């Protein structure tokens, strides 16, 4: 599969192992950075954009109450801006699931 492909996948990210040992007052900001790093690794683009709903989901229990695992939908899309440095960007949004247990990475078919 080429990097040029536009694709959407759902991942479960374990934030607990990424935030272990982090100061309580830095957990939510560190979670945002780790999600961006995760999206960069899996989508191969340095331009990562977070949905405002994801930011609300991270901060919903305060700065130190970040959830242990989150289900994310990461989309690699084309950048239509004229003076863009990269042709593609990653867009990360939360997926509401009752439990993250047993969920695998899934490719989501877009209707676009």
UniProtKB/Swiss-Prot annotation:
Designated name of the protein: Large ribosomal subunit protein eL31
GO biological process: cytoplasmic translation
Similarity field: Belongs to the eukaryotic ribosomal protein eL31 family.
Native species: Candida albicans (strain SC5314 / ATCC MYA-2876)
Gene behind the chain: RPL31B
Keyword Transit peptide: no
Any single GO CC term annotated in Swiss-Prot or TrEMBL for this entry: preribosome
Main subcellular location of this protein, as a coarse class: cytoplasm
Stated role: Component of the ribosome, a large ribonucleoprotein complex responsible for the synthesis of proteins in the cell. The small ribosomal subunit (SSU) binds messenger RNAs (mRNAs) and translates the encoded message by selecting cognate aminoacyl-transfer RNA (tRNA) molecules. The large subunit (LSU) contains the ribosomal catalytic site termed the peptidyl transferase center (PTC), which catalyzes the formation of peptide bonds, thereby polymerizing the amino acids delivered by tRNAs into a polypeptide chain.
Record PANTHER family: 60S RIBOSOMAL PROTEIN L31
UniProt-listed CDD domains: Ribosomal_L31e
Binding partners and assembly: Component of the large ribosomal subunit. Mature ribosomes consist of a small (40S) and a large (60S) subunit. The 40S subunit contains about 32 different proteins and 1 molecule of RNA (18S). The 60S subunit contains 45 different proteins and 3 molecules of RNA (25S, 5.8S and 5S).
Cellular compartments annotated: Cytoplasm
InterPro entries noted in UniProt: Ribosomal_eL31, Ribosomal_eL31_CS, Ribosomal_eL31_dom_sf
Keywords on record: Cytoplasm, Ribonucleoprotein, Ribosomal protein
Keyword Iron applies: no
GO molecular function term, any single one: structural constituent of ribosome
């Amino acid at each position: 599969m080429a990097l040029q492909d536009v694709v959407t996948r759902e991942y479960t990210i374990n934030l607990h192992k990424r935030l272990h040992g982090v100061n309580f007052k830095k957990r939510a900001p560190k979670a945002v950075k780790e999600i961006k790093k995760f999206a960069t690794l899996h989508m191969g683009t340095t331009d990562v954009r977070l949905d405002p709903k994801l930011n609300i989901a991270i901060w919903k229990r305060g700065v130190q109450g970040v959830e242990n695992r989150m289900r994310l939908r990461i989309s690699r899309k084309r950048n239509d801006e004229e003076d863009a440095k990269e042709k593609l960007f990653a867009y990360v949004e939360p997926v509401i699931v009752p439990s993250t247990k047993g969920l695998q990475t899934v490719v989501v078919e877009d209707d676009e």
